[in-house]
Swiss-Prot record:
UniProt GO cellular component terms: L-cysteine desulfurase complex
InterPro entries with a match to the protein in the record: Aminotrans_V_dom, Aminotrans_V_PyrdxlP_BS, Cys_deSase_IscS, Cysteine_dSase, PyrdxlP-dep_Trfase, PyrdxlP-dep_Trfase_major, PyrdxlP-dep_Trfase_small
Cofactor (UniProt): pyridoxal 5'-phosphate
Listed name of the protein: Cysteine desulfurase IscS
Residues that hold pyridoxal 5'-phosphate according to the record: A75, T76, N155, Q183, S203, G204, H205, T243
GO BP: any one term: [2Fe-2S] cluster assembly
Segment forming the signal sequence: none
Catalytic activity: (sulfur carrier)-H + L-cysteine = (sulfur carrier)-SH + L-alanine
Keywords: 2Fe-2S, Cytoplasm, Iron, Iron-sulfur, Metal-binding, Pyridoxal phosphate, Transferase
Species the sequence originates in: Salmonella arizonae (strain ATCC BAA-731 / CDC346-86 / RSK2980)
Family, per entry: Belongs to the class-V pyridoxal-phosphate-dependent aminotransferase family. NifS/IscS subfamily.
């Protein structure tokens, strides 16, 4: 077993060796290096064919028509293109958008930008387990609501939203439904021929493909229109201009092909490892599970250890690559906005750790992790005056802290 152990698969994944090998064939002079938009010679035709194959592989994983897949630079761009693109195109119908407080920053900040441009956004608070209350969603829908954006799997706590029912609710009212599926694609079954989802964002690097490539699903029947955000040569049916990065597209396609083949066995294996990890640490005193194991993705476990500072725990766990309560916001000392939206106090939010498992995680690594976490928590609490007071029965909420 090699240290450190990588348990941050929700932040990014290593490229699968099969994917890397495939990508190498699309870079150099002796490979297929052409521009897929070059129609006058075979270098272009071969590149275009490679892109078509990858587009099919992505469509097959999610039950879409390949013509509904638009390549972008990643899920952040896909979220921007979907939300701004739909809002701008349909603004004559209304200017009201609904999303949730626990979305990824790529959705929240895009909505904030639209607010500055005169749109109105309702941010729904989830229930304490992270699941959106569908009655609250229904109550928020208005005649001028044009778009709902609610993710499939949350990147911090792993809870799975009921996108099928939300889709039905939106379709019944003629509201466009966008889903950020970055964390779920290739991990949970998605069938867009059955789901009433109009726009869906995908990424390459969360599923063992390369970074810098993603896609947006744009429904054809009923036809959804979006306004392009990137202008130029009119690539991707006018929705996203820019020369297609063939090697990255091929890599994403291969990653999605592998995911389709291995998803079922892989998810059962990861669920087993995640449960093994939780069972190994759940009897530690004052440990809290954030999210919902039953309605959770099989590969994410978010846990708070009371009376332990998250930053010091990360330092103690230096043999583990994990993230503290804020994945994309790990650099800031603010507690995770996702955990705060669940109604959690700052102390617990600060002491949270996200373990995310993946294709190369082993049972041996999980057992090492359990042992290390148990020892580290014990050691840090031995040093903590707060833990000592808690053990003596002092109500820490009643203490007046002096501000120096």
């Amino acid at each position: 077993m090699k240290l450190p152990i990588y348990l941050d698969y929700s932040a990014t994944t290593p490229v699968d060796p099969r994917v890397a090998e495939k990508m190498m064939q699309f870079l150099t002079l002796d490979g297929t290096f052409g521009n897929p938009a070059s129609r006058s010679h075979r270098f272009g035709w071969q590149a275009e064919e490679a892109v078509d194959i990858a587009r099919n592989q992505i469509a097959e994983l999610v039950g879409a028509d390949p013509r509904e897949i638009v390549f972008t630079s990643g899920a952040t761009e896909s979220d921007n293109l979907a939300i701004k693109g739909a809002a701008n195109f349909y603004q004559k119908k209304g200017k009201h958008i609904i999303t949730s407080k626990t979305e990824h920053k790529a959705v929240l900040d895009t909505c904030r930008q639209l607010e500055r441009e005169g749109f109105e956004v309702t941010y729904l608070a989830p229930q304490s387990n992270g699941i959106i209350d569908l009655k609250a969603l229904e109550a928020a829908m208005r005649d001028d609501t044009i778009l709902v954006s609610i993710m499939h799997v949350n990147n911090e706590i792993g809870v799975v939203q009921d996108i099928a029912t939300i889709g039905e609710m939106c379709r019944a009212r003629g509201i466009i439904y966008h889903v950020d599926a970055t964390q779920s694609v290739g991990k949970l079954p998605i069938d867009l021929s059955q789901l009433k989802v109009d726009l869906m964002s995908f990424s390459g690097h969360k599923i063992y493909g390369p970074k810098g490539i993603g896609a947006l699903y744009v429904r054809r029947k009923p036809r959804i229109r979006i306004e392009a955000q990137m202008h130029g040569g009119g690539h991707e049916r006018g929705m996203r201009s820019g020369t297609l990065p063939v090697h990255q597209i091929v890599g994403m396609g291969e990653a999605y092909r592998i995911a389709k083949e291995e998803m079922e066995t892989e998810m059962a294996r990861l669920r087993g490892l995640r449960n093994r990890l939780w069972n190994g640490i759940k009897d530690i005193e004052e440990v809290y599970l954030n999210g919902d194991l039953e309605q959770g993705a099989p590969n994410i476990l978010n846990v708070s250890f009371n009376y332990v500072e998250g930053e010091s725990l990360i330092m103690a766990l230096k043999d583990l690559a994990v993230s503290s309560g804020s994945a994309c916001t790990s650099a800031s000392l603010e507690p995770s906005y996702v955990l705060r939206a669940l109604g959690m106090n700052d102390e617990l939010a600060h002491s949270s750790i996200r373990f995310s498992l993946g294709r190369f995680t082993t049972e041996e690594e999980i057992d090492y992790t359990i042992d290390l976490v148990r020892k580290s928590i014990g050691r840090l609490r031995d040093l903590s005056p707060l833990w000592e007071m808690y053990k003596q029965g002092v109500d820490l909420n009643s203490i007046e802290w002096a501000h120096h």
